[in-house]
Amino acid sequence: MLKAIIIVLFLLLIVAAVIGFYSAKTTLSIPRQTLDGARRWQEDHYDISWYDELEKTDYTVSSYDGYLVHVQFLHNHLPADQYVIISHGYTDNRFGALKYAKMYLDLGFHVIIYDLRGHGLNEETFCTYSVREARDLLTLIEDTRSRYEGIKMLGIHGESLGAATSVACLKYHPQIAFVVADCGFSDIFGVLENGLKASRMPAGILKLTSVCAKIRYGFSLAEMRPIDSLKGNEIPVLFIHGADDPFILPENSERMQAETSGYSELHLIPDAVHAESALKDPETYAAVLREFLQRIKDNL
């Protein structure tokens, strides 16, 4: 009888391990869009004809661990001493940043867009939902300051995973003037829990997934908490979130705003779902951004 119980427990352990490692692989994998596919999506949803007319410079930056990040610099046709680095969302690539790039160009910024780790033209790898990605962004900030002279204002702007990455980067106290975080998550556990509720899957699978992710990839889901980077933060942050976002709930931005120590704003865009605030109400979005940046400039 004891032998049978041991065999059953052993089989259950094997099943749990298979489920856990499969779940970890699925959760941390990146279904990549091609650059052409991402560009077509942008063209179908708003005008990007201005992009082809820009002077652009492509280059790569070696991150903290030697990983190469593909970057594109969008030159403002006007003399500018303001720069912004825009981080796109999960599965997307640099073209996902274009919906924000035009706003910054119109405000007199040079714009830097890039492919996040594991996305776009970069080498395939797994996603750590802001952990490694934040260190990549820090490297880009440092590279930008060394590459371009006369920078008076440098900020970062992110959408979804890019927003979480931008917030998580604050733990390193980067030399930047502002952060714009659009529909970012405060911790990946909450996003996945929300998804499990919708699919009626047992919540306990997340803990198993987290353990297996740590074993296989070296990072647990519990480490993927951008909100922890806001403790003691004094860099101004503009949080924007679609009021009807069903994927990353607006309360993520609300919690993060409550956590930061510095100046912050939170704007919920009515009727906007995930990552579509700038498309749902571009005029309001541009006005909120312009007024926030003016307040930052007035206090520099």
Go through each PLM region and give its residues.
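Catalytic histidine-centered segment of alpha/beta-hydrolase-like enzymes
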Residues: A272-A286
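An N-terminal hydrophobic leader/cap segment in hydrolases
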Residues: A4-S62, Q72
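Conserved alpha/beta-hydrolase
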Residues: Y104-E123
